[in-house]
């Protein structure tokens, strides 16, 4: 696996998820701005508090409780305000990358074998958590870049 391939996969995934936000919320600049702002701040939160605490923080920002910690079952569009929608999308995007990468046939197919990353890191060794944290920071670097370039700034 070539590092350039992995970087290309990260860039491709980040471009896709940010483009989806831009398309779905073309009339809602507040969601775009919140997503961009939270993506910008997420790496610092991870470095200060850890990946697990950051993922739990994102979930705590949702306006209604979720039945289970499972990124696949979270529907960001079901949350009412821009802040909740943005946090839900960021959790879902980060979790999807860590769990699945860009798919089974890609250069990077995830770290957690499809398991929700928050559950995964609570059960794994410090080395597994460190690897997951590095990957989270790497994908967020791309998400930040595309969000800053493509989305409206927070009002």
Curated annotation (Swiss-Prot):
Annotated Gene Ontology cellular component terms: cytoplasm
Superkingdom, taxonomy of origin: Archaea
GO biological process, one term: defense response to virus
Swiss-Prot/TrEMBL keywords: Antiviral defense, Cytoplasm
InterPro entries in the record: AF1862-like_dom_sf, CRISPR-assoc_prot_Cmr5
Family membership: Belongs to the CRISPR system Cmr5 family.
Function, as annotated: CRISPR (clustered regularly interspaced short palindromic repeat), is an adaptive immune system that provides protection against mobile genetic elements (viruses, transposable elements and conjugative plasmids). CRISPR clusters contain sequences complementary to antecedent mobile elements and target invading nucleic acids. CRISPR clusters are transcribed and processed into CRISPR RNA (crRNA). Part of the Cmr ribonucleoprotein complex.
Name listed for the protein in its UniProt record: CRISPR system Cmr subunit Cmr5
Protein's organism: Archaeoglobus fulgidus (strain ATCC 49558 / DSM 4304 / JCM 9628 / NBRC 100126 / VC-16)
Primary gene name: cmr5
């Amino acid at each position: 696996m070539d590092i350039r391939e992995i970087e290309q996969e990260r860039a491709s995934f980040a471009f896709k998820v940010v483009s989806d936000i831009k398309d779905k919320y073309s009339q809602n600049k507040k969601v775009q701005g919140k997503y961009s702002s939270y993506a910008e701040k997420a790496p610092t939160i991870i470095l200060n508090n850890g990946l697990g605490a950051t993922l739990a923080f994102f979930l705590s920002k949702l306006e209604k409780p979720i039945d289970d910690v499972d990124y696949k079952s979270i529907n960001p569009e079901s949350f009412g305000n821009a802040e909740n929608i943005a946090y839900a999308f960021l959790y879902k995007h980060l979790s999807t990358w860590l769990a699945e990468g860009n798919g089974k046939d890609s250069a990077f197919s995830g770290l957690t074998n499809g398991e929700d990353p928050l559950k995964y890191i609570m059960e794994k060794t410090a080395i597994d958590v460190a690897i997951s944290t590095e990957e989270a920071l790497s994908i967020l670097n791309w998400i930040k870049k595309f969000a800053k370039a493509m989305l409206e700034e927070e009002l």
